[in-house]
Amino acid sequence: MNYPEHIRDIKLNLLMSENTITIDPSKRKSKFAFLRPGYGLVKQLIKMGAIVTGSRALKCYKINGKQLFDRKPRDWDFIVTEKMAMKICDEHGVTYKDGSIMVLKQMILFRDSSYGDSRVVPTDIQLIVKDELPEYREVDGIRFSELSHIIDEKYKLVSPHHNSMNKHDEDLRQIIARFNNL
């Protein structure tokens, strides 16, 4: 599939057309999310201003009343500043030196032990550390990454240099198909 062409068309359409883009924050979690271990950390991140991004944020977006994405997200992706990440680490007794977190390409991964990684909380939560927070939309006190930013990041993840191509490839195909059917 020629992703650059489709992504360019989508981004131009988002900029130039009169589509109504809304966010339904209730779509970010299941009805029983509060029962999952680690949900306290999710609430803490939202309260401190972390930006929800990735598949979970995509699931919340609607264009002209139609949901753009419907895959059930398995993890939480947040964009945070280094200061925010350090605060979370301090509050959970985690340091870079103790091996409890992995730092890969500016991402701090809090992973479930079933993946073989050290864990802080038994829910997949990825903190993507940036020098500055990207543009976002805030709805009901929750910050969501801009739709174009999420699509750009998904595209970067299907480049030949990444291993997690299948999930992100399928996500982009779904977004393109649904966007073309608006």
Question: Which residues does each predicted region cover?
Answer:
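Short N-terminal secondary-structure initiator segments
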Residues: 2-12, 90-101
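Active-site nucleotide-donor binding segment shared across nucleotidyl transfer reactions
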Residues: 38-89
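Catalytic cores of NTP-dependent nucleotidyl/adenyl transfer enzymes across multiple folds
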Residues: 2-28, 74, 118-182
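Signature of uroporphyrinogen-III synthase
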Residues: 26, 34-38
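Short, low-complexity, polar/charged sequence segments that are solvent-exposed and flexible
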Residues: 70-72, 97-101, 163-164
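Conserved catalytic core of two-metal-ion nucleotidyltransferases
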Residues: 93-136
